[in-house]
């Protein structure tokens, strides 16, 4: 795993997740690396980039998602340990 920050926005429903993803990549220099359907309608969108950009992106994504649905969680990991890659959904690491 690169030493880039990892940002996550978890929403209730796919529409809010797509809205969050769109806002995140438009608002900051981040790379959309994937999403994960958790179950019970929960979807987590994951981005990577430098810490400041990821923080700005997750803030924008959460705000956009709240306009069309429900945000369950927002989190930024500034420098994830390399072992975190083992628990990320396939295709995201």
Curated annotation (Swiss-Prot):
Q: Does the keyword Transport apply?
A: yes
> What is the biotechnology note for this entry, i.e. how is it used?
Artificial BMCs can be made in E.coli by expressing pduA-pduB/B'-pduJ-pduK-pduN-pduU-pduT (in this order); pduT and pduU are optional, while pduA, pduB/B', pduJ, pduK and pduN are essential. A construct with the reversed gene order does not make BMCs. Ethanogenic BMCs can be made in E.coli by targeting pyruvate decarboxylase (pdc) and alcohol dehydrogenase (adh) to them. PduP(1-18)-Pdc and PduD(1-18)-Adh strains targeted to the BMC (PduA, PduB, PduJ, PduK, PduN, PduU) make significantly more ethanol than strains where Pdc and Adh are not targeted to the BMC.
Per UniProt, what does mutating residue 79 to A do? Forms sheets but not nanotubes upon overexpression of PduA*
Q: Which subcellular locations apply to this protein? A: Bacterial microcompartment
Please tell me whether the keyword Transport is annotated for this protein.
yes
According to the UniProt entry, the coiled-coil residues are: none
Its name, as the record gives it, is: Bacterial microcompartment shell protein PduA
Protein's GO biological process? propanediol catabolic process
Q: Which InterPro entries match?
A: Bact_microcomp_CS (IPR020808), BMC_dom (IPR000249), BMC_shell (IPR050575), CcmK-like_sf (IPR037233), CcmK/CsoS1_BMC (IPR044872)
Tell me the subunit arrangement: Homohexamer with a central pore; Lys-26 and Arg-79 interactions are very important for hexamer symmetry. The hexamers pack against each other in arrays. Interacts individually with shell proteins PduB, PduB', PduJ, PduK, PduN and PduU. Modeling suggests PduC, PduD, PduE, PduL and PduP interact with a cleft formed by the C-terminal segments of 2 adjacent PduA subunits (on the BMC luminal side) in the hexamer.
Q: Which GO terms describe its cellular component?
A: bacterial microcompartment
PROSITE patterns given in the database record: BMC_1, BMC_2
- Organism placement in taxonomy: Bacteria, Pseudomonadati, Pseudomonadota, Gammaproteobacteria, Enterobacterales
Q: Residue ranges of the BMC domain?
A: 5-89
Q: Which UniProt keywords apply?
A: Bacterial microcompartment, Transport
Q: Which family does it belong to?
A: Belongs to the bacterial microcompartments protein family.
Involved pathway(s): Polyol metabolism; 1,2-propanediol degradation
* Described function: One of the major shell proteins of the bacterial microcompartment (BMC) dedicated to 1,2-propanediol (1,2-PD) degradation, probably important for metabolite diffusion into and out of the BMC. Overexpression of a C-terminally mutated form (PduA*) makes thin parallel filaments with a honeycomb-like assembly in cross-section that probably form nanotubes. The filaments interfere with septation. PduA is probably the hub for binding multiple enzymes to the interior of the BMC. At least one of PduA or PduJ is required for BMC assembly; it must be encoded as the first gene in the pdu operon. Expression of a cosmid containing the full 21-gene pdu operon in E.coli allows E.coli to grow on 1,2-PD with the appearance of BMCs in its cytoplasm. Overexpression of this protein leads to aberrant intracellular filaments.
Deletion phenotype: When the whole pdu operon except this gene is expressed in E.coli no BMCs are made; with the whole operon many BMCs are produced in E.coli. This gene is not essential for BMC formation; a pduB/B'-pduJ-pduK-pduN-pduU-pduT strain produces BMCs in E.coli.
Protein source organism: Citrobacter freundii
